[in-house]
């Protein structure tokens, strides 16, 4: 199925990038952020190798692939990279979509699609969806850590080099001699 092939391609690229970022940061035990050397807090893993949610109280450090949850609201999520430094929580999420849309779809009548209430003032686009996602992660973390303040919410959008398109217009990704996808661009969206 054509759609399944495109879905598989997108999932493989996304997983590859996320795994690369996590492996790169876990090569170190500390890292400098905002002029402060902080520890890298490794994700918790159970006996079978499955990542599990840690205690939600955060201390200064960098948390790759951090599970955040709020039992009272029955919500959880996984932030790609959380940094706690100088009394603030910063969240970065990696996105590997073909594009990040900043505006909702506008039809031939000039009507732009909006989200549903209570967010009906916002365009229905993936940048706003991601903003809500990261804002919810921040909300969860601040509920568990009331002495900390909200820092930056950042989307890191990664695009890959194409060597062409297939018969259906989907991209064919370029790979380097080691078989790794070639990154074309990184764009940061500070929300």
Where are these regions (language model features)?
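Conserved catalytic cores of phosphodiester-cleaving nucleases, focusing on short active-site segments
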Residues: 18, 79-103, 110-116, 137
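Surface-exposed cleft-lining segments at the edges of enzyme active sites
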Residues: 3-7, 120-125
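Short, mixed charged/polar active-site loops
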Residues: 74-76, 89, 171, 181
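Metal-dependent nuclease catalytic regions and adjoining charged, substrate-binding loops involved
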Residues: 123-191
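Short, flexible loop/turn elements at secondary-structure junctions
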Residues: 66-70, 83-85, 96-98, 157-159
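Metal-dependent nuclease catalytic cores that hydrolyze phosphodiester bonds in DNA/RNA
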Residues: 1-78
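A structural signal for short, well-ordered beta-strand segments and their strand-loop junctions
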Residues: 63, 90-93, 152-157
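Gram-negative outer-membrane beta-barrel domains
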Residues: 71-72, 114-120
